[in-house]
Amino acid sequence: MKKIIYLLIMFFSIGLLSGCEKTETKMDNINIYTTTYPINFIINKLYEDHAKVYSVYPTGVDVDKYELSTRKLEEYSKSDLFVFNSLDKDRDYAVKMINLNSKLKVIDVATGMKYNNSIEELWLSPNNYLMMAENLKNGLAEYITNPYLVEEINDKYKDLEYEISKLDANLTEAITSAKYKIIVTDSDIFKFLEKYGLKVISLEDNKDLSTNKIEEVKNLIKEKQIKYIYSTTSKTNDTVTKLIKDNNLEQITINTMHSTDGNITNSNENYITIMTNNINELKKELYK
């Protein structure tokens, strides 16, 4: 009788171990697809030891203009997890992929978020980016039942939270303590900085670009309050080009990271270093 009980206990124990192993490997060594670099950076920070992470976009394409084919969507729908931004066209891809594979796991990094001018402010604002990171952490926790793996992700999130919070503090301090609190840009993307107390004059080529706004910038240049114009690319609009040429201004290009690789040029660069450099570039005008 004792032998039978012993065998039953052993059988039950093996069953439990098998169940645990299945749970642990369910979200281990998986294939994850993302879209742009800011999402890719977070998932790698939190989960790179347990997954291979890819972008649905080919390297170097314009993610705003590129459209995924049905064949590619079918291919990506067979992956384990798709991490997307529901405030971008990613949402349409997520819907199509789920329709192709109802078992596909998905995480929306933009849950509960919104933007006012441009989608880039979701990650160029460290405060917003921290929300994206938290959404991703919580999304992973919904799929992972291994408590040790959840704890590992939470620990990595705390490290990332510290780094992003430090960026937010540095940006806040840079603007709060600045002698000059006005910048001129060629894009509304930079308007998120108004929440930090900065006056942003956007010369984006649209219906809001008035003669009065251009004259305001010219007066600020005469008063030596403006020395730089901030852009998202090296190519800017005609109005800004003329202002730069006529007034000997310097154009500063800010990396918005809205691409598959974040416009990274060397292996030492990442979201943290790029944002640190962006803040330092901003200081050139604020502390001239």
Please place each PLM-identified region on the residue numbering.
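Sec-dependent N-terminal signal peptides of Gram-positive bacterial secreted proteins and lipoproteins
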Residues: 2-23
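Extracytoplasmic metal-acquisition and chelation regions
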Residues: 19-288
